[in-house]
Amino acid sequence: MVHLSAEEKGHINAIWSKVSVDQTGAEALGRLLIVYPWTSRFFDHFGDLSSAKGVMGNAKVQGHGAKVLTSFGDAVKNMDNLKGTFAKLSELHCDKLHVDPENFRLLGNILVICLAEHFGKDFTPEVQAAWQKLVAGVATALAHKYH
């Protein structure tokens, strides 16, 4: 699994404490659906996702994005036990939803992009590296049930 130093954990917590879960979650999920449109097949019940404007203005995308990022907050709280933290979600996404585990990596990378955009100069290369490690760890934990 991922080992994060005390300094890296500090970088992650400093940014996370300023994150708007609703806004950033909606933005990250919306960008995923726009940039990787095949991911929308998991969200057929969300209505029209055929345009960027439709995706970003979709209340269900916004709500689920907030839910996803709230869950990601569990990773921030449990950085030393990502596998255990996401065991049930891994099982759900593997056994019931059949989500391609690559999608977890894609969403994690988009989250890092959103954070970089929101935090600008505070999102230094060191901060980005710490976040990349965390999102990679979360993606691995979510994909655990697939192995």
UniProtKB/Swiss-Prot annotation:
Q: Which residues carry this modification: N6-acetyllysine?
A: K60, K83, K145
Complexes and interactors: Heterotetramer of two alpha chains and two beta chains.
Annotated protein name in UniProt: Hemoglobin subunit beta
Residue numbers of S-nitrosocysteine PTMs: C94
Q: What Gene Ontology terms for biological process does this UniProt record contain?
A: hydrogen peroxide catabolic process
Q: Which organism is it from?
A: Sminthopsis crassicaudata
Residues the record lists as N-acetylvaline modifications: V2
In terms of Pfam families, this protein maps to:
Globin (PF00042)
Keyword Cytoplasm in annotation: no
Q: Which InterPro entries match?
A: Globin, Globin-like_sf, Globin/Proto, Hemoglobin_b, Hemoglobin_oxygen_transport
Question: Which key words tag this protein in UniProt?
Answer: Acetylation, Heme, Iron, Metal-binding, Oxygen transport, S-nitrosylation, Transport
GO CC aspect terms? blood microparticle; haptoglobin-hemoglobin complex; hemoglobin complex
Q: Which SUPFAM superfamilies match?
A: Globin-like
* GO MF terms, alphabetically ordered: haptoglobin binding; heme binding; metal ion binding; organic acid binding; oxygen binding; oxygen carrier activity; peroxidase activity
Give the Gene3D superfamilies listed for this entry: Globins
Q: In which tissues is it expressed?
A: Red blood cells.
Q: Would I find DNA-binding among this entry's keywords?
A: no
Q: Where does heme b bind?
A: H64, H93
What this protein is reported to do is described as: Involved in oxygen transport from the lung to the various peripheral tissues.
Domain spans labelled Globin:
3-147
The record's comment on protein family reads:
Belongs to the globin family.
